[in-house]
Amino acid sequence: METVLKAIADWIKGILTAGIMSNLSGLFDDVNTQVGNIAQQVGTKPSSFEPRVFAMIEALSRNVVLPIAGVILTFIACHELIQMITEHNNLVQFEPALILKWIFKTAISVWMISNTFDIIMAVFDITQKVVSDSSGIIAGNTRVNDIGLSMLQSSLMQMDVGSLFGLFLQSFFIGITMRILSIVIFVIVYGRMIEIYCMVSLAPIPMATFGTHEQSHMGQNYLKCLFALGFQGFLILICVAIYAVLIQSVAISGDAINSIWSIVGYTVLLCFSLFKTSSVTKSVLGAH
């Protein structure tokens, strides 16, 4: 009878051990892929990230948004002219230099909305130069190795059924968590670029407000937000560099499960840090 029970216990151990190893094998592949691609993705210009999408955004901005910006600019220019005339007693005390100032401001505003995309790309050229230069300095291996898992299987068979069942539940939860974290990293990196495309599509409207002091805060805040999105890539690289240092300090050895939980914790910390990069850059640049 004891032999039968031992055989059943060994059979259950074999099933649980196989399940644990199945859950843990390739555990870090998705996260390694996403983290490894971060530097390449954040270092790509909006025009190069997805050229077809960028061409569509540019066409929409020029054909749909730009005419609206022209109407806004016309209203602002007329309002500025009327205000200038009324402030100087209906031209009785009017100085010719003021009309030249108005013409100059209006011409600059027209030039800005006509060359909106060149200005926007110049902003991202500056920020991407910072990102590309920093990527050469910030270097680190972000890949998590699971070589220690091969030593884990032999030690699992020495454990009792209850402990193995607990480890099986942990490994199942860890597997789901790591896949969710890889999706979160993907969403953060690609969501930033989609946010950039959305900001760029409406660029002519805030650019049209630079012609008046009362409304120019809209355009100024817009440029701050653009710089914040650009420099967010720099902070993302810093987060990845810190993650690379932390992750290499973890060795999957005898106590593999605890080591894996440490890696999960560092990956959660990475995701949280990536989420915070947007608010940090906006706070530093005073954008809202």
Give each language-model segment a name.
Residues 1-72, 87-97, 107-177, 216-221, ...:
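Gly/Ser-rich, low-complexity
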Residues 66-79, 196:
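Hydrophobic alpha-helical transmembrane segments
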Residues 182-189, 193-196, 200-239:
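Extended serine/threonine-enriched, polar tracts that run as long, contiguous segments within proteins
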Residues 75, 120-127, 184-187, 191, ...:
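Membrane-embedded alpha-helices of multi-pass transport/permease systems
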Residues 81-94, 182-186, 214-215:
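Membrane-water interface regions at transmembrane-helix termini and the short interhelical loops
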